[in-house]
Amino acid sequence: MTQLVLLRHGESVSNRDGCFTGWGDAPLTPRGEREAEQAGNLLKKAGHKFDICFTSELSRANDTLRIVLSVMGQDEPVVQRNWRLNERHYGALEGINRWKAIRKYGFCPILSSQCRFDAPPPPLDPADIRFPGNQACYATIDPGELPLGESMRQAFARMLPYWQQTITPEIQRGKRVLIVAHKHILRGLIMQLDGLSIIQLIKLSVATGRPLIYELDDNLHPIRHYYADTGLTGHTG
């Protein structure tokens, strides 16, 4: 048996302000920092140690991981950051308050992009500064691979090769793995691990700052999963 720990970053400024964040680099709020500290304490108390940690290119996930490892007193794990673990890209909605987005684009299109697996948000213009292809930190990536906006399905498809080709082999080698990422990316991983249906996925909630522990068999099939702060099986926050 091996363990895998999934953690959604602590509350960000955009979470607090009710904005679509996506690839926008919103920092943690003081509450988000406390959530990261609490997660670190829970993992330390449970005796967790990590050989390798995976996270996105976004500061709210990076800072959550940094705080967790500091609280745990762990400076030695390898940390790999990759854009494929970035949050779902919200296209033209990036950085916009949800109510403003509804007023601009209409209630039904916004609701559809939030509740339907295959519904993308309104796309960005490629000339928009919010397009990752126009940002220096993604300059080494083929612009054709970078999103102008993503449905849930498209975000999962972008993440999946990294899970299969990079993260899974580390788990199979017996490495103790922590993934600090984002709501939709973690939902995609949970869908993959647990074989959830699309209907089950739509109902799935992943709380900020709560470590979700998976116990896996030799074939990486889940034996059970539970939150570190409750020990209770389940995903909802």
UniProtKB/Swiss-Prot annotation:
Active site residues of this protein: H9 (tele-phosphohistidine intermediate), E87 (proton donor/acceptor)
Pathway connected to this protein: Carbohydrate degradation; glycolysis; pyruvate from D-glyceraldehyde 3-phosphate: step 3/5
Keywords assigned by UniProt, alphabetized: Gluconeogenesis, Glycolysis, Isomerase
Residues that, per the record, bind substrate: 8-15, 21-22, 60, 87-90
Annotated site residue numbers, Transition state stabilizer: H182
EC number: 5.4.2.11
Domain of life: Bacteria
Top-level class of the enzyme under EC nomenclature: isomerase
Function of the molecule: Catalyzes the interconversion of 2-phosphoglycerate and 3-phosphoglycerate.
Family indicated by similarity: Belongs to the phosphoglycerate mutase family. BPG-dependent PGAM subfamily.
PANTHER family hit by this protein: PHOSPHOGLYCERATE MUTASE
Annotated protein name in UniProt: 2,3-bisphosphoglycerate-dependent phosphoglycerate mutase 1
Organism: Nitrosospira multiformis (strain ATCC 25196 / NCIMB 11849 / C 71)
Lineage: Bacteria, Pseudomonadati, Pseudomonadota, Betaproteobacteria, Nitrosomonadales
